[in-house]
Amino acid sequence: MAKQNTVLIKLVSSADTGFFYVKKKNPRKTTEKLEFKKYDPVARKHVVFKEAKMK
């Protein structure tokens, strides 16, 4: 079997609410850290989510 290309990463809220999204990423194609502006239901507004490693 071939090695899996995608890895799971965690997108952590910059509002420090503890809320996160889980997303797949191909580390060979996108080497830089991901950053998205998404909705944080705890803060109840759109904030920047930054990539962190899954434990």
Curated annotation (Swiss-Prot):
UniProt keyword terms in alphabetical order: Ribonucleoprotein, Ribosomal protein
Domain of life: Bacteria
SUPFAM superfamilies in UniProt: Zn-binding ribosomal proteins (SSF57829)
GO biological process, one term: translation
Gene Ontology MF term list: structural constituent of ribosome
Signal sequence extent: none
GO cellular component: cytoplasm; large ribosomal subunit
Pfam families: Ribosomal_L33
InterPro entries, A to Z: Ribosomal_bL33, Ribosomal_bL33_CS, Ribosomal_bL33_sf, Ribosomal_zn-bd
Matches recorded under NCBIfam families: PRK00595.1, rpmG_bact
Similarity annotation: Belongs to the bacterial ribosomal protein bL33 family.
HAMAP family assigned to the protein according to its UniProt record, in alphabetical order: Ribosomal_bL33
Designated name of the protein: Large ribosomal subunit protein bL33
Organism annotation: Rhodospirillum centenum (strain ATCC 51521 / SW)
Gene name as annotated: rpmG
